[in-house]
From Swiss-Prot:
Phosphorylated. The non-phosphorylated form(s) exhibited the strongest poly(rC)-binding activity. (Microbial infection) Proteolytically cleaved by picornavirus proteinase 3CD. The modification Phosphoserine is found at residues 173, 189, 272, 364-365. It comes from the Eukaryota. It comes from Homo sapiens (Human). Detected in all tissues examined. It holds the Pfam family KH_1. This is Poly(rC)-binding protein 2. One of its GO terms (molecular function) is promoter-enhancer loop anchoring activity. The keyword Ubl conjugation applies. There is a cross-link at residues 115, 185, 322 (Glycyl lysine isopeptide (Lys-Gly) (interchain with G-Cter in SUMO2)).
């Protein structure tokens, strides 16, 4: 593969996102941030590191290609140093390879793997690096992890070739829709379920109201501020700031705010059932029904794979949700939500989260 397109200073601003564990990130940051500061100054690349209360963190490198790969090489060298240090008093017979994970849009993985795996095989053979593309997307995102292992130079060459493939794919067929970036979850985050009970999430599952942007490997603005929510066992939960706001609204029996802006979906913003009390406490509330109209091309994100998402929404809200069969000639599907006013409101909220994540319609509060 010709990596001259990278070596020759291609006129693009490249962004590489790495997924690392906290200990690795700590080493890269260094004492009082001295190590990462040195990397920034010597490479000329922008190096951003996601918030520190997560077991996993995203390191984003952005800038001209020569700056990016200089910073990348410095990170690889640092990881290599850490392995050498750990081997000093070790009785292990073999030295482990440097291993890292790239985070890339799932839409690019097909081109990267190639027909029958030919492209990924070519990259492995030409660079000597071990490369594995994850089969599943990272939680609550449209991105996958690519694990690369080997000696430093092999890894650097491998990442260059991966970027070349992605650049070529972009130039031939620009992506459709948005990329929902992966956001590692905090290790302990207050959440609330229907019924009012507080919990703290400590597992590996999380959900986010992501900063959605039509970004690929080349977007320098990928690290925008997220709007976060958290999950336990894969179920949506309401973040604490929103919880306080919604609790106040419930006490005032005011209308539930469905969106931060106009979604264009009939029945979602215009219809807001009154919240009659704190969620889950009014078990004897009168059962009512509410109908939504959702475009056919978005109904899939509400249903989820094998109905997983719609079942989450049902369990979280306590509402019954029925999606009508498609009607010939119609571009919309009818969704009927039945339950108490509070459960309907929560179901609407969760549906709107799914739609906003899919379309990028969620603004900042």
């Amino acid at each position: 593969m010709d990596t001259g397109v990278i070596e020759g200073g291609l006129n693009v601003t490249l962004t590489i996102r790495l997924l690392m564990h906290g200990k690795e990130v700590g080493s890269i940051i260094g004492k009082k941030g001295e190590s990462v500061k040195k990397m920034r100054e010597e490479s000329g690349a922008r190096i951003n590191i996601s918030e520190g209360n997560c077991p996993e963190r995203i390191i984003t490198l952005a800038g001209p290609t020569n700056a990016i790969f200089k910073a990348f090489a410095m990170i690889i060298d640092k990881l290599e140093e850490d392995i050498s240090s750990s081997m000093t008093n070790s009785t292990a017979a073999s030295r482990p390879p440097v291993t890292l994970r790239l985070v890339v849009p799932a839409s690019q993985c097909g081109s990267l793997i190639g027909k029958g795996g030919c492209k990924i095989k070519e990259i492995r053979e030409s660079t000597g690096a071990q490369v594995q593309v994850a089969g599943d997307m990272l939680p609550n995102s449209t991105e996958r992890a690519i694990t690369i292992a080997g000696i430093p130079q092999s890894i650097i060459e491998c990442v260059k070739q991966i970027c070349v493939v992605m650049l070529e794919t972009l130039s031939q067929s620009p992506p459709k829709g948005v990329t929902i970036p992966y956001r590692p979850k905090p290790s302990s985050s207050p959440v609330i379920f229907a019924g009012g009970q507080d919990r703290y999430s400590t597992g590996s599952d999380s959900a986010s109201f992501p900063h959605t942007t039509p970004s690929m490997c080349l977007n320098p603005d990928l690290e925008g501020p997220p709007l976060e929510a958290y999950t336990i066992q894969g179920q949506y939960a309401i973040p604490q700031p929103d919880l306080t706001k919604l609790h106040q609204l419930a006490m005032q029996q005011s209308h539930f705010p469905m969106t931060h802006g106009n979604t264009g979906f009939s029945g979602i913003e215009s219809s807001s059932p009154e919240v009659k009390g704190y969620w889950g406490l009014d078990a004897s509330a009168q059962t009512t029904s509410h109908e939504l109209t959702i475009p056919n091309d978005l109904i899939g994100c509400i249903i989820g794979r094998q109905g997983a998402k719609i079942n989450e929404i049902r369990q979280m809200s306590g509402a019954q949700i029925k999606i009508a069969n498609p009607v010939e000639g119609s571009t919309d599907r009818q969704v009927t939500i039945t339950g108490s006013a509070a459960s309907i409101s929560l179901a609407q909220y969760l549906i709107n989260v799914r739609l906003s994540s899919e379309t990028g319609g969620m603004g900042s509060s």
